[in-house]
Each structure stands twice: as structure tokens, then as C-alpha cells.
A protein has these predicted regions:
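Gly/Ser-rich "nucleophile elbow"/oxyanion-hole loop immediately N-terminal to the catalytic nucleophile
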Residues: 167-212
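Short beta-strand/loop motif that positions the catalytic acidic residue
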Residues: 290, 296-298
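N-terminal targeting or regulatory segments adjacent to alpha/beta-hydrolase or S9 domains
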Residues: 16-83
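Histidine-bearing beta->alpha loop at or near hydrolase active sites
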Residues: 326-333
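Short beta-strand element of the alpha/beta-hydrolase
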Residues: 100, 110-119
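Hydrolase active-site cap/lid region
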Residues: 219-268, 325
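Catalytic active-site module of serine/aspartate enzymes centered on a nucleophile-bearing elbow/loop
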Residues: 336-351
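Cap/lid segment of the alpha/beta-hydrolase catalytic domain
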Residues: 125, 131-132, 138-186, 243
Length: 351
């Protein structure tokens, strides 16, 4: 008689659905927030795609690459044995001074590296929370998003950080160059290039990971950094804005979309133009640029970044990819996901 694992046992591998058999035959009994899983796997998104989006991002990447990979490293006050902690500063899009945390293990050879992106309104994790990666043999850098809770500079004409309202910032200008997330996407990709250029790093073994806004920036980083090796987003934000709106989920992290319409377009006279402009910072429309091997984590009960919005992006990724499905989980802690993500990166490191 075959022995079943205890229901709470840790999965053996990072992937729970490698062969993608017909999901209609999977015996998962659960409430339904969004589409059935087999429909999610075919869903292609609702948000309009700007006609010139590829040219737009080609020009933006060229602008970023002209800034180079130079950075200033300052030893942090927090230090531990066997690794060195740094505050890393560089000049990002539109001249902003961008900050990241960097931890480098003591080693006499080049190392794999990961870049981490935090959730909306937050900041890079404390140095102590990054040490699990250095213990596993990785260099790790963690971005402070401009305008949020960290040390990066926001050059948007305001004193201090604004924390929220970043999706809609620039919409009133009717110019995608003015969208704040255009610059944050570039900051993320530039940090990956800076890490690749560090003498301690093997540039062929660099990955990115993060959850929510961090998942969105992981995808954007991969889309704008062709040399990135691995991409591990967890329930990514900033995908398929129109679908979020149509599901009446423009609340919580997406609340500013509702606020914008109520204040500036209460009759939705410019609805198409607004969603098309948001299309420039919609990950589904740049996902085809991703070359990194990708592992996404999705909770099917996510009512903040709904599964269909995530799959709108996932389904457009053409590189090798997989998704780990959590049927009963939403926008929250996903058991074993962090371990699976590290295992995914260790496979890169050991290749």
C-alpha cells in the first residue's frame, strides 16, 4: 500500500504542477474568486496595449544604460562575521539618487547574486533579513523604491516621500514619460546591471525576486534586463489594471485608481485613454521581453492582485516558466514559497 505524506509535509520540489495536465480534471474543491484555473491559463488580459510600447521601453532602456553601472558603496553600521554589509547609492532615471542595501559574503571567487524588491509603500528589508541569502552563498542587493519608505530620492518636485499614489502619478500629464513607475521599473533594472558589474559577482548567475509590488518589479527587471538568469515573482502587482477595475478590486493597493476616476474623470469620459496610458506600466505588455527562467507564486483567493491579472502577464512570458498554485491562499504568507524561491535560485547557482 502506498504511503501518503502527512498533509502538512514540506513539498519535495519547488514546482507543484510541472506537466500542466488539464486543470478541469484536477480534484480541487474550493471557493471561486476569479476564473477557473484552466481559464486562467489561457487568459490574455483586458488592459489596452499602447501601440508604441516596445519603442517606448527601448528608448527608456537606452536612457538607463547611458547612466552606466557606477555606484557608491559605504559600509553600513550593521556588520556581521563572514559578510560585509553596504549602503549602495547610484544615479537613476531623471537624476534621482537611488539607495539599495548590499551584502557580500567573504569569498575568493565570483558568486551568484539575487536582487530583491519590496512591497508597495515599503522599504528594503533589514540587513539581518538578507543574511539567509549570504549564508547560501549569494550576494544580495535590495532596492529602496523612490518615493516610498526607504532612503531613495524622489525627484518629483515634493519634499520627502509620498508613499502612495504612485500608479496614478503622471496620468494627468498624458505622457508616459511622466509616469512614476516608468522610473521605478528602470531603477530596478539598473540595480540588476550594477550587481552584475560588481567584481564579486558572476554576471551569468543573477536572479530577481519579490512579492506584490516586489513581484511586479521582479517581472519588470527581467523584461528590461535580458541577461537576468532567474525571475521569481510572488503574486505580482501592476498587471492588467482594467481587469482589476472590472472585478471591483480597485481598493487596498489599487485604491488610487478609484480615487483618480472619482476626482478627475467621474463620468469615465476618458476611461480608454487612462487605461491605455497605464498600459505603459502594465507588466503584461512587456512580459514578452523576459528571457529569464521564471517561477511565479499565485494564491487563487488573492483579492488584492487577482489571479487573472497575474496570469495576464504569466501567459505572455515565452521563456521557460512555471507557476506554483496555492488554491486556498490570498495576498498573504504562502507556506514554503520562500524556500521554493531559494531552491530555484540555488539551481542557477549550482548549474
Amino acid at each position: 500500500m502506498a504511503h501518503m505524506k502527512h498533509p502538512g509535509a514540506r513539498p519535495d520540489t519547488y514546482c507543484n504542477h510541472t506537466n500542466h495536465a488539464d486543470d478541469r480534471r484536477r480534484n480541487i474543491i474550493m471557493p471561486m474568486l476569479d476564473m477557473p484555473l484552466y481559464e486562467l491559463r489561457q487568459y490574455q488580459g483586458r488592459n489596452p496595449r499602447p501601440a508604441d510600447i516596445d519603442a517606448f521601453w527601448d528608448a527608456a532602456v537606452a536612457e538607463m544604460e547611458a547612466l552606466g553601472t557606477s555606484c557608491d558603496l559605504m559600509k553600513a553600521d550593521f556588520q556581521v562575521p563572514h559578510s560585509t554589509c553596504y549602503d549602495l547609492f547610484y544615479t537613476g532615471a531623471k537624476g534621482a539618487r537611488i539607495h539599495a542595501k548590499l551584502v557580500v559574503p567573504d569569498a575568493d571567487k565570483s558568486l551568484p547574486a539575487v536582487v530583491n524588491f519590496h512591497g508597495y509603500t515599503g522599504r528594503a528589508p533589514d540587513f539581518v533579513d538578507l543574511l539567509k541569502w549570504t549564508a547560501a552563498g549569494f550576494v544580495i542587493a535590495a532596492l529602496d523604491c523612490r518615493g516610498q519608505a526607504g532612503e531613495s530620492e524622489d525627484v518629483g518636485g515634493v519634499k520627502g516621500n509620498t508613499h502612495q499614489g504612485h500608479i496614478i502619478r503622471g496620468l494627468a500629464e498624458n505622457d508616459p514619460e511622466k509616469l512614476l513607475f516608468r522610473d521605478i521599473f528602470l531603477d530596478a533594472a539598473q540595480l540588476a546591471r550594477i550587481v552584475m558589474a560588481l567584481p564579486q559577482v558572476d554576471e551569468t548567475k543573477v536572479g530577481a525576486f519579490g512579492g506584490s509590488q516586489g513581484g511586479a518589479l521582479t517581472l519588470a527587471c527581467a523584461a528590461l534586463t535580458p541577461k537576468l538568469n532567474r525571475c521569481a515573482p510572488t503574486y505580482p502587482f501592476l498587471c492588467d489594471y482594467q481587469r482589476v477595475w472590472e472585478m471591483d478590486l480597485a481598493k487596498d493597493a489599487y485604491q488610487e485608481l478609484r480615487d483618480y476616476f472619482r476626482r478627475y474623470d467621474p463620468l469615465h469620459a476618458h476611461e480608454k485613454e487612462i487605461f491605455t496610458l497605464l498600459g505603459y506600466i502594465d507588466n503584461q505588455h512587456i512580459a514578452h521581453r523576459i528571457q529569464a527562467k521564471t517561477l511565479m507564486f499565485t494564491g487563487l483567493m488573492d483579492n488584492i492582485c487577482p489571479p487573472s491579472s497575474q496570469f495576464a502577464t504569466y501567459n505572455k512570458i515565452t521563456s521557460e516558466k512555471d507557476v506554483v498554485i496555492y488554491p486556498d491562499f490570498g495576498h498573504e504568507y504562502l507556506p514554503f514559497a520562500a524556500e521554493k524561491a531559494m531552491q530555484f535560485m540555488l539551481e542557477m547557482a549550482n548549474a
